[in-house]
Regions:
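Conserved hydrophobic beta-strand positions in leucine-rich repeat
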Residues: 70-72, 94-96, 113-117, 136-138, ...
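Leucine-rich solenoid repeat scaffolds
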Residues: 333-352
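Leucine-rich repeat
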Residues: 66, 88-91, 109-112, 129-133, ...
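Right-handed parallel beta-helix
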Residues: 93-122, 128-130, 135-140
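Canonical leucine-rich repeat
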Residues: 82-83, 104, 125, 146, ...
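N-terminal capping/linker segments that flank leucine-rich repeat
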Residues: 2-93, 110, 131, 152, ...
Length: 352
C-alpha cells in the first residue's frame, strides 16, 4: 500500500512540475484570454470548462510539450474576444474555427504550420514572422486586409467571404491553392505565382485578371464578376475553367492542351473562340448571344450545352465522342453532325 501511495504522490508531483514548467509568457497570454467574456454567458474559461487556470496542462484542446504549447484545438467552443498567441515558439497548429473571436495575433511563431480561424468575426489577424506556415484558413470573417509578406512557405490560403477590396499575393511561389470567393475584390494580383494550381475567385467585382507567370494553374473559377473581356492563353496545365455570370462579351481560350471543362454560361458572348484545346470533354456556353458556334474536330467532346443563344449554325462535325447536345431555344437552320458516331441525344426543341 505504501508503494502504491508513493507512486500516486510521485505522479501528482510530476504533473504539478510539468504544469509549472509552462513558459510564463505563454501562460500569461492564455490566462488573459480565459478572463474575457465568451460568446454566451460567462468567460472563455467557463466555455472551455476550465476549473483551474493555473493548471493549463489540464485544459481540453491544449497540447503542451517540454513546457511550451504545441497545439490549440478549440473549434466551436463559443469563445470570443482577442486572442494573443504571439511568441509561442513551439506552436505548430491552431484551430479556433466556429467561434466569435474578433482578433488573433500569431506573429513570431517559428513552428506554426497550420492555422484555422474560419467562421469567426475577425477584423484583424497578424501573421508576421511565421516562416513555417503552409496553410491558412480564415474564411467567413470580417477582414479587410491581410499581410503575408513574412509567410514564405504558404501553400494553401482560404480567405473567402471576407471584406477585401484588394488582395495581393503576387510572386508567392509556393502558393498552390487560393480561395478568395465571395469577397468584394476589385483587384486581385496573382502574377508570378508559379506553383499556383487552384484559383477560386468567383463572386467578386473583378473587371480583369492577370494570369502572367501562373503556368501551372489547373482549376480557374471567376464566376459572377464583372469581366467583359478575357483571353486565356498558354496555360498548359489548365483542366477546368469556369467564368459564368460576368457580362462577358469576348472570350478566347487558346493553347490550353489539358483543358477538359469549359463553362461560360450566362454572359453576353456573341462569339466564342476555342483554339488549341483538343482535350475538351464538356462545354457549357448556354444563355449567351452566340450567333454561330464551331466546335468541330474536338474528338474528346462528350457533352455540349449551347441552349438559349441566337445560333443559326452549329458545327460539331467529327466529334466522335459526342453523346449529348442541348441546343434548345436558338434559330438553328444548319446543324452539322457528320462523324458523330456516338451521338445519342439532341435536345433541339424551340428552334425557329
Amino acid at each position: 500500500m505504501k508503494k502504491i501511495l508513493s507512486l500516486i504522490a510521485l505522479a501528482v508531483i510530476s504533473v504539478s512540475a510539468f504544469a509549472q514548467k509552462l513558459d510564463k509568457a505563454e501562460a500569461r497570454q492564455l490566462k488573459a484570454f480565459f478572463t474575457q467574456s465568451a460568446e454566451k454567458d460567462g468567460t472563455n474559461a467557463n466555455a472551455l470548462k476550465v476549473s483551474d487556470v493555473n493548471n493549463l496542462a489540464a485544459v481540453e484542446g491544449l497540447t503542451i510539450e517540454n513546457g511550451h504549447v504545441t497545439a490549440i484545438e478549440w473549434k466551436d467552443k463559443h469563445l470570443a474576444g482577442s486572442l494573443d498567441l504571439s511568441g509561442f515558439k513551439a506552436l505548430k497548429k491552431v484551430d479556433v474555427s466556429r467561434n466569435r473571436i474578433s482578433s488573433i495575433d500569431v506573429s513570431d511563431n517559428p513552428a506554426l504550420a497550420d492555422f484555422n480561424a474560419s467562421r469567426n468575426v475577425l477584423t484583424a489577424v497578424n501573421f508576421a514572422n511565421c516562416p513555417a506556415l503552409t496553410k491558412i484558413s480564415v474564411y467567413k470573417n470580417r477582414l479587410t486586409d491581410v499581410s503575408l509578406e513574412t509567410v514564405p512557405l504558404l501553400e494553401n490560403l482560404n480567405v473567402s467571404n471576407n471584406l477585401f477590396v484588394e488582395l495581393n499575393v503576387s510572386n508567392s511561389t509556393t502558393l498552390k491553392t487560393l480561395n478568395c470567393q465571395g469577397c468584394h475584390l476589385e483587384n486581385l494580383m496573382v502574377s508570378g505565382c508559379t506553383n499556383l494550381q487552384n484559383l477560386y475567385c468567383g463572386y467578386n467585382k473583378l473587371t480583369s485578371l492577370n494570369l502572367f507567370g501562373v503556368e501551372n494553374l489547373q482549376n480557374l473559377n471567376v464566376d459572377d464578376n464583372e469581366i467583359t473581356t478575357m483571353i486565356v492563353s498558354g496555360l498548359p496545365a489548365l483542366s477546368t475553367f469556369v467564368c459564368s455570370d460576368n457580362r462577358m462579351t469576348t472570350l478566347g481560350v487558346r493553347n490550353c492542351d489539358r483543358l477538359i471543362d469549359l463553362v461560360c454560361s450566362y454572359n453576353d458572348l456573341t462569339t466564342l473562340s476555342v483554339e488549341g484545346c483538343p482535350n475538351l470533354t464538356f462545354v457549357d456556353c448556354s444563355y449567351n448571344d452566340l450567333t454561330q458556334l464551331d466546335l468541330s474536330n474536338l474528338t474528346f467532346l462528350q457533352r455540349l450545352l449551347c441552349n438559349n443563344n441566337q445560333l443559326n449554325t452549329l458545327d460539331v462535325s467529327f466529334d466522335s465522342a459526342l453523346v449529348y447536345v442541348n441546343c434548345r431555344y436558338n434559330f438553328i437552320t444548319d446543324f452539322r453532325t457528320i462523324g458523330c458516331t456516338n451521338l445519342r441525344m439532341v435536345a433541339c426543341q424551340w428552334n425557329f
